[in-house]
Amino acid sequence: IGTSSNGGWGHNIDELFIGVSGIRTVAVADDINTGVADAMKRHRLTQATRGFLDWRQMLANIKPDIVAICSRNIQQHAEMAIAAAEAGVRGIFMEKPFVQSVTQADAVVAACETSNTKLNLALVNRYCPTMATVSELIADGKLGTLLEVRARGKEDVRGGGEDLWVLGPHVLDLMVHFGGAPQWCSATATTKGKPVTPDDFIAGAEGIPMIAGDSITASFGLADGPTGFFASTREAGLKQPNFGLTLLGTKGEIHIRPDYIPQAYFRAAPAWRMNRPYPWTPIGDEGLAPDLTDQGVDRSAKRASWGRLAVADLIDAIQTDREPETGMFTGLTLTEMNEAVYALSLIHI
C-alpha cells in the first residue's frame, strides 16, 4: 500500500519483497491511478483486478497473507495496520516512523495481538550483520562496562523535532538494542535558545504529530545500566552528517554510522584517553576488519540487503509464532520515547 499523492512509497520497501523465495506479490493499492500503474509495473502485475485505488477494497477482495504499508506519510499507518489485522493478514511490514502517538501504538498492538498478526518495522540498520558483531564485541568485554550511548540525528533542515521523529527511530532503536529498555527520561527542547512552550508546536511534515524546537537534547536511563543521550540541532553546519551513535565504555568505544560502509568502528581505549594515538578500526560482518573500505560497494544495494533480512525476519516470525526483532513493541517503545521528550521539555511551564 502506497499513497503517491501524499508521501509516496517511502524508501521503496515494497521492492524488498521482489524475488524473495516463497513470496508472490498479488496486488497493489495507491490513491492515484499513476501510482497504481507504476506499482503494478514494478511488481509485474498484468491483471487490472490486481490494482486498487482503495486499500480497504484490496484487503477485502484479495485477503493477502502479508501487507506492506509503504507510505512515507504516517497519517494512516495506524488505521491501515488495524484494518489489516482485522482482515486477518498474518504479517505487516511497515515503513517507519511507526504511528503518530502512543494511543495509536497501543491500538495497533491490541489489534495485532487479537489476530496474532506479526508486524515488523523497516528499521533496516538493525539488520546489518555488523550490528551482530558489535553485540559480540560488547559481550566479549572489548568496551569494558558500557557507560553511555550517544546518538545524533542528521541535523539538517529537519534538525530538532522533525529529526527526532523521522531519523530518530534508527538511532533510538539501536540505543535500546545495545543499552536496554528506557526506564526514565529527561529532556529539553528549545527554539533559538529559549525553552519551547505549548504555543510553539506546529504540525509536523509527512504526518508526524505536533512538534516544536530547533534543538533537542534528551537523556534516557537504560535497563542494562548505561545512560542514553539523543541530540539534534537544526543545520548544525557539518558537511558530513552527524547521524549515528557512539557507545562509550570504560575500556573502549564504538562509533556507528547508519547506512555507510564500514558501518561501525572500534577504538581500543575510552574516549577520554588521549595520551597516545588509538586508531579507529573498521568493524565488519565477522569481526574487526582493518582493511574494510567502501571501495566498490553499492551502498543502496547493501541497504536493500538489510531490508530483505528484515522481511525474512517477519516471515520467520509468522512461521514460528514469535515477535520480529524490530516489531510492534519496538515501535511502541520508540513512540513512548518521542512523546516523553516533549512531555519532559514542557515540565518547566
Where are these regions (language model features)?
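N-terminal Rossmann-like dinucleotide-binding module
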Residues: I1-R44
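Core-facing hydrophobic residues within beta-strands of well-ordered domains
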Residues: I23-T25, L146, P182
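Glycine- and charged-residue-rich phosphate/anionic-cofactor binding loop of Rossmann-like
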Residues: R24-V26, R299, A317-L334
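Active-site loop of classical SDR/Rossmann-like NAD(P)-dependent oxidoreductases
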Residues: D31-T34, L238, R299-V311
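Beta-loop-alpha module in the N-terminal Rossmann-like domain of NAD(P)-dependent dehydrogenases
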Residues: T46-C112, W306
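A contiguous active-site-proximal alpha/beta segment in oxidoreductase catalytic domains
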Residues: R90-F93, F98-E162, V166-V171
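Conserved small/polar residues in nucleotide/adenosyl-binding loops
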Residues: I347-I349
